[in-house]
């Protein structure tokens, strides 16, 4: 059966949304919103969307036939059947107000994702860290096994050139967002939880027990024949496991894990390990990603694929040939500075645990390099809530260039800004950080800071990602020695 025939068969089994033809996204340029819009436009729906600026997501959607509107205005929703919003959108947005006045249904992003998943075999990946990488690895394994899944990911899957794709099979592999508890809308067949830590606590009223209970509720959205795939190395996951009334498959480095990694080693950007599973032969894996945290992400993909009887050869090949995800330990090149050659890596991690995992991966893969990090804190509330953890983790690099907080719409919080964090790290006495008041000042500092052989990392979830690309395009007047990846 050809892919066209397979897709026609799939569509015959999935009812169209009754009377819904024209779908409008408010904030369509976000990765999550844009991914769902891409799947829907490829399914044949008329897609429009608004955002405050053009970006790579909106450009791709426009090339696929979506109508992109820059700016938010009431008339944008006058001819649509449903409006999709994310929690980042202000309720006073003129398009939201107009939709309410016109009695047009307004649904959250996760509700639309749940609708896509309703008649498919859904695999939903949740957790504080590692969701994007794990989702990408699972999608890659299923693609290698010719399962041709639909996927919606929170980052760019390099091999696909996009973060979302409409497949021809019954599978939908999607990142599940706990930041606003909207993942409770999803009803997958398989749920993955990578880990659970305190983050986005404003959603949960500062109550960590409420956050844990919400993850339990998410797993109980599984049908009685579904499966929860969980990282047993995580302390909080071990704590909630007795509360899970579904089949559980565990993974990790722990000997208790159903899917266990042994013999881990790292060589530069690659990790190698052997996977042990009950009732199956051991398999040697080479993963084209660095760090123990990425081995855990790969174990989740192996566990999901093994439950679905995907052949080990597809798993081995997909992990070995994995091309990575945008802004996840992304190697941007080798640059010739006035003081010598410097390696540039960009990473999205913005929680202390994520930053620590990145530091460990850098140390393990390039032990002889001095580690220089330009870090941009993300959100005042996160900086406040995890302040001491940030001080501890950021003190572990060799040289720190600390930018001010990327607000992400939040009002400043006294004592939780970049200057305060810089002072606290300096008082710790391990390193003497350099405060960078504005991102556009970073390039001017680098010639005096970088040394031959350094590993220079740009780290954070704000606009430092765009800044790293500018640096990679010779914003310092540096010559790229290795082609950008």
Curated annotation (Swiss-Prot):
GO CC, one annotated term: cytoplasm
InterPro entries: Mur-like_cat_sf, Mur_ligase_C, Mur_ligase_C_dom_sf, Mur_ligase_cen, Mur_ligase_N, MurCDEF_pg_biosynth, UDP-N-AcMur_Ala_ligase_MurC
Annotated catalysed reactions: UDP-N-acetyl-alpha-D-muramate + L-alanine + ATP = UDP-N-acetyl-alpha-D-muramoyl-L-alanine + ADP + phosphate + H(+)
Pfam families linked: Mur_ligase, Mur_ligase_C, Mur_ligase_M
Enzyme Commission number(s) from the entry: 6.3.2.8
Major localisation: cytoplasm
Pathway membership: Cell wall biogenesis; peptidoglycan biosynthesis
Gene3D superfamilies listed in its UniProt record: Mur ligase, C-terminal domain, Mur-like, catalytic domain, NAD(P)-binding Rossmann-like Domain
Gene Ontology MF terms in the entry: ATP binding; UDP-N-acetylmuramate-L-alanine ligase activity
Gene Ontology process terms (BP): cell division; cell wall organization; peptidoglycan biosynthetic process; regulation of cell shape
Keywords noted in UniProt: ATP-binding, Cell cycle, Cell division, Cell shape, Cell wall biogenesis/degradation, Cytoplasm, Ligase, Nucleotide-binding, Peptidoglycan synthesis
Organism domain of life: Bacteria
Localization of this protein: Cytoplasm
Binding site for ATP: 127-133
Protein family: Belongs to the MurCDEF family.
Purpose: Cell wall formation.
Protein name: UDP-N-acetylmuramate--L-alanine ligase
Gene name, Swiss-Prot/TrEMBL: murC
């Amino acid at each position: 059966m050809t892919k066209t025939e397979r897709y026609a068969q799939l569509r015959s089994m999935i009812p169209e949304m009754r009377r819904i033809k024209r779908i409008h996204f408010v904030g369509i340029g976000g990765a999550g919103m844009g991914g769902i819009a891409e799947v829907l436009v490829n399914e044949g729906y008329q897609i429009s969307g608004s955002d405050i600026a053009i970006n790579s997501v909106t450009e791709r959607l426009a090339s696929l036939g979506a109508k992109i509107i820059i700016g938010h205005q009431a008339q944008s929703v006058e001819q649509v059947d449903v409006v999709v919003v994310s929690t980042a959108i202000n309720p006073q947005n003129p398009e939201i107000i107009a939709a309410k006045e016109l009695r047009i249904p307004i649904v959250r992003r996760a509700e639309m994702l749940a609708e896509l998943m309703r008649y498919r075999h859904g695999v939903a990946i949740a957790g504080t860290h590692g969701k994007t990488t794990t989702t990408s690895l699972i999608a890659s394994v299923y693609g290698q096994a010719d399962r041709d899944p639909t996927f919606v990911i929170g980052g760019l899957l390099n091999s696909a050139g996009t973060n979302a794709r409409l497949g021809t099979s019954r599978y939908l592999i999607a990142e599940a967002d706990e930041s606003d508890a909207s993942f409770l809308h999803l009803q997958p067949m398989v749920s993955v939880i990578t880990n659970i830590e305190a983050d986005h606590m404003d959603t949960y009223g500062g109550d960590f027990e409420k956050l844990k209970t919400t993850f339990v509720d998410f797993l109980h959205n599984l049908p009685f024949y579904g499966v929860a795939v969980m990282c047993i190395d995580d302390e909080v996951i071990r704590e909630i496991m007795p509360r899970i009334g579904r089949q559980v498959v565990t993974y990790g480095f722990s000997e208790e894990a159903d899917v266990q990694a042994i013999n881990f080693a790292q060589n530069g950007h690659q990790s190698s390990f052997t996977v042990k599973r009950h009732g199956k032969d051991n398999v040697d894996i080479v993963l084209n990603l660095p760090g123990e945290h990425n081995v855990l992400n790969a174990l989740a993909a192996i566990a999901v694929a093994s439950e679905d009887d995907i052949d080990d050869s597809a798993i081995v090949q997909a992990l070995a040939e994995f091309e990575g995800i945008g802004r996840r330990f992304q190697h941007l090149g080798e640059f010739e500075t006035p003081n010598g050659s410097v390696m540039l890596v960009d990473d999205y991690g913005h929680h202390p645990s994520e930053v620590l995992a990145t530091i460990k991966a850098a140390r393990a893969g390039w032990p002889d390099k001095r580690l220089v990090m330009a870090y941009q804190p993300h959100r005042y509330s996160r900086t406040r809530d995890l302040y001491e953890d940030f001080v501890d983790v950021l003190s572990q690099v060799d040289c720190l260039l600390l930018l001010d907080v990327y607000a992400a719409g939040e009002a400043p919080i006294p004592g939780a800004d970049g200057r305060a964090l810089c002072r606290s790290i300096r008082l710790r006495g391990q390193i003497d950080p350099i405060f960078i008041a504005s991102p556009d000042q970073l390039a001017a500092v680098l010639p005096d800071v970088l040394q031959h052989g350094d590993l220079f990392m740009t780290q954070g979830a704000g606009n430092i990602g765009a800044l790293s690309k500018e640096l990679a395009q010779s914003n310092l007047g540096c010559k790229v020695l290795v082609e950008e990846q």
